[in-house]
Amino acid sequence: IVLYLSPSDYHRVHSPVTGTILAKIHLLGRTYPVNEFGLKHMSKVLSRNERLITYMGHLYGILSLVKVGAMNVSSIKYTNSLATHLNKGDELAYFEFGSTVVLLIENGAFEFLQELCIGTQVRVGEPLGYWGAGFQK
């Protein structure tokens, strides 16, 4: 799941699950734009820009939250850098200005809502789909 944050969006990242923080990695990189133009014209921009990656173990497996810095706004901060456990909805990190969040989920662990399509604007607390066997809410 790629969630682009425009300058007018909310710039805080909340945990999508209750779970344990397994690892945190800060990868230095470029700060190319990650807007529609940047994604279209810059090869692998989401893996070339600066990233702050959080790996979390949860009831249905492991996920990675990749916070991607962008041109002029590569300022990604953990809300509580010492946290080892988060509840679903807890604030994890924030951008001091807009950028992008990439959520990597194990295959088969999550089912997206059928009405969710590319370009759909989502807000904090709105579901993207369902976790686990039988895809329970």
Task: Enumerate the language-model features and the residues they cover.
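Contiguous, well-folded functional domains in the mature portion of proteins
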Residues: I1-K137
